[in-house]
Amino acid sequence: MLRYLTAGESHGPALVATMEGIPAHVQVGAVEISEELRRRRLGAGRGARMSFEADELELLAGFRHGETLGDPLAIRIGNSEWEKWRTVMAPGPVAPEDLAGHARAAALTRPRPGHADLAGMQKYDFDEARPILERASARETAARVALGAIAKAFLKQSLGIEVLSHVVSLGPVSAPNGPRPDPSDLTRIDADPVRCADSVTSKRMVAEIEACRKEGDTLGGVVEVLAYGLPAGLGSHSQGDRRLDARLAGALMGIQAIKGVEFGDGFDLTRRRGSQAHDWMEPTEGGIHRVSDRAGGTEGGMSTGQILRVRAAMKPIATVPRALPTVDVTTGEAANAHHQRSDVCAVPAAGVVAEAMAALVLAECALEKFGGDSVTETRRNAQAYLDRLAARGLAVAP
């Protein structure tokens, strides 16, 4: 079983992540994980923090000589701004006079609409929002991206599975339905300022971001995650919480600001008749072939062996520079919300986080299906399964 946890606050000393269940001999280390963290900082529309924020990665446990040991893994991502926050975010008691001179120590009593501020204050009995927003911040996703880098390495080395993402819409601007990006396109997508596969649409998206920035507003959008090389049979039909699509949807909805998820043609399927909504099958010399991929690579809660295709919708960032109306919880009076430093648009980065979450779910499902204490064992078990499908005439044909 694959298990992981993250800990840490946005302006605390560090984020920490632990994970248990990754087999031995996955070739992955600081270079590969740091590259994924770099990708998370990509994209037009990011705030000032991205220009100086450094993810100070340290591998604490479970690695040796560039590979995993099969032990629990532990990772630390240091906060390069910690010295500025050492007093305000100190874990131990701080005298009131020591806080008096710090602007950052001002009580945040005007909760921001769209954030966890007010609900968190109500739930955890805080008088201000700082204790809530620090953990609710999307900064936490850096830890999940680091773990996702390990899951990606395991998937590729054991099963040949590759996961990528691209931005398909940003605000009112949508990319046309064109050729689906594959892993060979990832470098080109990452080089694009909004991680859009269509260069013409990308320019329109950048213009929309700049217009939003000038108007003191924010933008949301939709990212698509694609997974290539999946075998049929990951997940299960037997219980709702074991269905692959349910697990992926839950993982993606767990990303800050994600408000919707769809697989394949998703909501468009509701506008078609059944005869035009499903993926017909036909026999070929290579096995059973589906003539379309409307389902997005899952049927009955299991992978079909086709390309997994899932989209996640990100709402506009809730920290709006021109400040939304709220209530000051100290006075009970109407007020404008606090403005914390934020992005205009973080949709390109959300795609990288979504890749990580999808990889973690797929790695867990792969280990449930094939097991293995080492990458070699997982690979051997998976190949035996594929050979058995072929012998029975049930292989998946591209």
Swiss-Prot record:
Disordered: region residues: 279-300
Matches recorded under CDD domains: Chorismate_synthase
Enzyme class at the top of the EC tree: lyase
Co-factor binding comment: Reduced FMN (FMNH(2)).
GO CC terms of this entry: cytosol
Keyword Cell membrane: no
Domain of life: Bacteria
Annotated EC: 4.2.3.5
Keyword Lyase appears in the UniProt entry: yes
Annotated positions binding FMN: R135, A136, S137, Q256, A257, G300, K315, P316, I317, A318, T319, R341
A biological process term (GO) from this entry: chorismate biosynthetic process
Catalytic activities: 5-O-(1-carboxyvinyl)-3-phosphoshikimate = chorismate + phosphate
Family: Belongs to the chorismate synthase family.
Name of the protein: Chorismate synthase
Organism: Cutibacterium acnes (strain DSM 16379 / KPA171202)
